[in-house]
Amino acid sequence: MNEFQPVNRRQFLFTLGATAASAILLKGCGNPPSSSGGGTSSTTQPTAAGASDLEVKTIKLGYIPIFEAAPLIIGREKGFFAKYGLDVEVSKQASWAAARDNVILGSAGGGIDGGQWQMPMPALLTEGAISNGQKVPMYVLACLSTQGNGIAVSNQLKAQNLGLKLAPNRDFILNYPQTSGRKFKASYTFPNANQDFWIRYWFAAGGIDPDKDIELLTVPSAETLQNMRNGTIDCFSTGDPWPSRIAKDDVGYQAALTGQMWPYHPEEFLALRADWVDKHPKATLALLMGLMEAQQWCDQKANRAEMAKILSGRNFFNVPVSILQPILEGQIKVGADGKDLNNFDAGPLFWKSPRGSVSYPYKGLTLWFLVESIRWGFNKQVLPDIAAAQKLNDRVTREDLWQEAAKKLGVPAADIPTGSTRGTETFFDGITYNPDSPQAYLQSLKIKRA
């Protein structure tokens, strides 16, 4: 299965609509009105000053039905984007390859203007590395969420009780060809990006070379359940609700959460075509302000039940509330024994975490995805070394636009980062990443291609 193959846009692109409903006076984290009923209607916010001055009133954003998309969907359904004068169309994408192909087209060509992205897809699109050489300059504007991802393992391997630390299972996985007639098979949803990196890091930390000791496959999120059920894959890395759906359907179990691997790590990001942003600076700020309010709303515990109901709608995730709500409330089962973490902060967070801002696009964090690309020898033509990665990252990640939108929105100064890093990041295996010394991080890794 190759996600780099071109896709038929008409076959995969679905347009989601929403109509205005009851008006409420709400600032991001207030008490919610009645649910929109699973994505069939929209709540109108009071219109903000300046909303009529935008260069454009519409934008089309793509998303994949996993929790990282929640702020985009909630921003649309709860009227936060409309409050700032924008009619945001959120368009479900069949795969990351479909999203890539559609942003190349742009909305004027029947595609999308941007949306939710695994990293470093925006940087790679900017350089034409994943678009057959066609450069599509992109800007990264905000981080959509932290955590909310996991690594699920087939129930056929329940006796092995694979967990966060794989060292005890190393011999079992290395000897898999002798015991099972093939290499251990693991999957992710798109190559050379977030979920590929998470599963590679997990294996490598356990002394298992993901390029030599196992077989890695690309499988879209929605197909992971069936592929694990029929034995095509032994484990996979993707965003919830799919790992939890595997456990709920008793097909597999969650061996590890990415939030355990790297607490409060950056997950997926909002990125737009640079030409759209450059042409519509006011609309870009309006989009960011609406997103920020949506992220604040998403982070309120009192709103998680309604959030689950909205996301469960057929137009969006098409997954039962009974699966979505526990994850959003931090009731996540991990391990072969299905132990419940019961920790709200272990689930997806959208606005703030114990490490500070979730939404802010720290350049030091977006850089990690490019450094990890260098680690595995990906896209050497555009990422030959750390200096090239830093230069590309500085061009693509727009901290300045986030800061401007936050100030305009009235976000407290204490919640607006002024630096480009959170300091040193520590992984579960003791490895540290200092964004100011990325080469030292690379040198500290035992299994790598760099």
Curated annotation (Swiss-Prot):
Gene3D superfamilies for this protein: Periplasmic binding protein-like II
One of the Pfam families matching this protein, by short name: NMT1_2
Signal peptide: 1-36
Induction: By carbon dioxide-limited conditions, probably via CmpR.
GO terms under biological process: monoatomic ion transport
Tagged with keyword Signal: yes
Domain of life according to the entry: Bacteria
Mod. after translation: Predicted to be exported by the Tat system. The position of the signal peptide cleavage has not been experimentally proven.
Membrane association type: Peripheral membrane protein
Keywords: Cell inner membrane, Cell membrane, Ion transport, Membrane, Signal, Transport
PROSITE patterns: TAT (PS51318)
Localization per Swiss-Prot or TrEMBL: Cell inner membrane
InterPro entries hit by this protein: NrtA/CpmA_ABC-bd_dom, TAT_signal
UniProt keyword Secreted present: no
Family: Belongs to the CmpA/NrtA family.
Function comment: Part of the ABC transporter complex CmpABCD involved in bicarbonate transport. Binds bicarbonate with high affinity.
Subunit structure: The complex is composed of two ATP-binding proteins (CmpC and CmpD), a transmembrane protein (CmpB) and a solute-binding protein (CmpA).
PANTHER family with a match to the protein in the record: ALIPHATIC SULFONATES-BINDING PROTEIN-RELATED, NITRATE_NITRITE BINDING PROTEIN NRTA
Name used for this protein in its record: Bicarbonate-binding protein CmpA
Originating gene: cmpA
